[in-house]
Design a protein with these regions (language model features):
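Amphipathic alpha-helical packing segments from all-alpha helical-bundle domains
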Residues: 5, 18, 22-25, 56-84, ...
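Hydrophobic alpha-helical connector segments
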Residues: 8-42, 94-101
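Amphipathic alpha-helical interaction elements
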Residues: 12, 16, 52, 110-113, ...
Length: 129
C-alpha cells in the first residue's frame, strides 16, 4: 500500500479528505502531479511496469496488479464510509466509483508517459469529476 511518502503518497492523503468528492479530486489531481513531475520519468511504474511484463516479468506484474487492487479497495472502502456518513447516497456503487477513478488515473499515467502535459491531464481529471 502506498505510504505517506514517495510517489504514491497522494493516495494516502486523498483518502483522508472529508468528502467523497474531495477524495476523488485529490486522488486524480495527485495522479496528474506524480506522473508529470519535472526531472522524473513520466507515467507510473505501477501501470507501465505491469503492461510491459512478459513471462519472465510475471512476478513483477502480479505485484504491481496487487498494489493497484489494494488502492482500488481502499478507495472503495472510503466511499463506503461516505455512504455510511450520508455524503454519498445509499445506492451509490462504491466499487464502480473506485474502479472508475483507478481507470482514469491509469489512463492519466499512460497519457503522461506518451508525452501529455500536466495542464492537459489536469483538464482530463477535472472533466472526469
Amino acid at each position: 500500500m502506498p505510504s505517506a511518502e514517495g510517489p504514491a503518497a497522494h493516495v494516502a492523503r486523498a483518502l483522508e479528505e472529508p468528502t467523497a468528492r474531495q477524495v476523488a479530486t485529490a486522488f486524480l489531481s495527485g495522479s496528474v502531479r506524480v506522473t508529470t513531475r519535472p526531472g522524473c520519468p513520466a507515467g507510473c511504474l505501477g501501470v507501465q511496469g505491469s503492461l510491459a511484463a512478459g513471462d519472465f516479468g510475471q512476478p513483477a506484474h502480479d505485484t504491481l496488479a496487487a498494489w493497484r487492487d489494494e488502492v482500488c479497495s481502499r478507495l472503495r472502502d472510503r466511499f463506503r464510509r461516505a455512504v455510511d456518513e450520508g455524503d454519498l447516497t445509499s445506492d451509490a456503487d462504491t466499487g464502480l466509483l473506485a474502479r472508475y477513478l483507478m481507470t482514469v488515473s491509469n489512463g492519466i499515467a499512460v497519457q503522461a508517459a506518451g508525452g501529455a502535459g500536466r495542464d492537459e491531464l489536469q483538464q482530463v481529471a477535472d472533466a472526469a469529476l
